[in-house]
Amino acid sequence: MQYPILLTIFLLLTNAYAQLPGKWQPRAPMPSARTEVAAAEVGGKIFLIGGYDKGGQLVEEYDPVKDSWRPRAPMPKPLHHIGAAAVNGKIYVIGGYISGVGPVDTVYEFDPGTDQWTSKKAMPTPRGALAVGIVGGKIYAAGGVTTNGRNTPANEAYDPAKDIWTRHASMITPRDHHAVGAVDGKLYAIAGRINGNHDRSIGDNEEYDPASNRWRARAPVPSVRSGIAAAILSGKIFVFGGEYGRRTHDHVESYDPTSDKWQRWSPMPTARHGLGAAVIGNSIYVISGGPKPGATFSSVNEMFTP
C-alpha cells in the first residue's frame, strides 16, 4: 500500500533534482589521476598543481580552446593540500604537506611564460589543507592544519610585489579542507573540517574585511562538507563537491554575498573531493579529485556553465 506513495515521492524528488539550473559537459581528462590538487588560471589556461599519488610535483596545463593538456615544469618539492593563486600572470603555491614530513611554510612562484619556479619568502605559519584568496593584489592564507596536527586560526597575507608577509585578524572558526573566495574586496571562508577529522565537517561561512581587519559570520553553506573547491563567477562563490563522513558529494551551491543567500545548482556528474576549480569565460572547469573518501584518484575534467 505504501509503494505508490514512496514511488511518487521518489519521482518528485528526482524531477526537482533534474530541474536544477546549470549545465555540465565532459572535457578532456587530465593525463594523470590525482587528488588534493590546486588549480589556477593564467592567460586563459588552467594549471593543475601537485596532489596525491605520483602527482606531488606534477604541473599540467589545460587549454580549453583546444581541449588538450600538456606538461609543465614540475614543482621544486612534492606537495599536496596546497593553496594556489595567480597574481599578475604568475602562480603562487603556498604551504601544503610533504608526505612523511608534514605541513610546510614554503612559497613558490611559477612563471608560465618562462616555465620556471622560484622560491619566495616563507609563510609565518607552516600549514597544509589551507585556503587562499586574493584582495588588492595580496594573497590571504587562512586556516589549515599546522605542525601540532591541529587547526590554526592564522590569517596571513602575502604581497608578491614586495615578497613580504603580514599577519591579520585570526579566523573566528579555525578549520582545514575549506575554501576561500574573494568578492568585492572581502574574503569568505566556507565549510571545511575540524582538526582534519572527516567526521567533523562544518558549514560555517565567515566574511573577512581587510579594510577593517574584522571577521563576521554569514549564512552557512546548506550542505555540510569539506575537501571542497570554489570559484568566483558573476559575483557569486560556487562551491563544488567535497566529502563528509564516509561519502563524497556531487553538490553544487553558490553564495551571493549581496543577499547573504545560497542557491543550489545541477549536481556534478562525478562526485569528488580534493578537486580543483578555475574559471574561463562564463564556465567553471572542475578537475581531478577523489571519487571515494580518502586517498582515491581521478583525472576527471568537467565543465560547468550556470
Regions found by a protein language model. Name each.
Residues 4-15:
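Bacterial N-terminal signal peptides
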Residues 16-306:
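Kelch-like beta-propeller repeat domains
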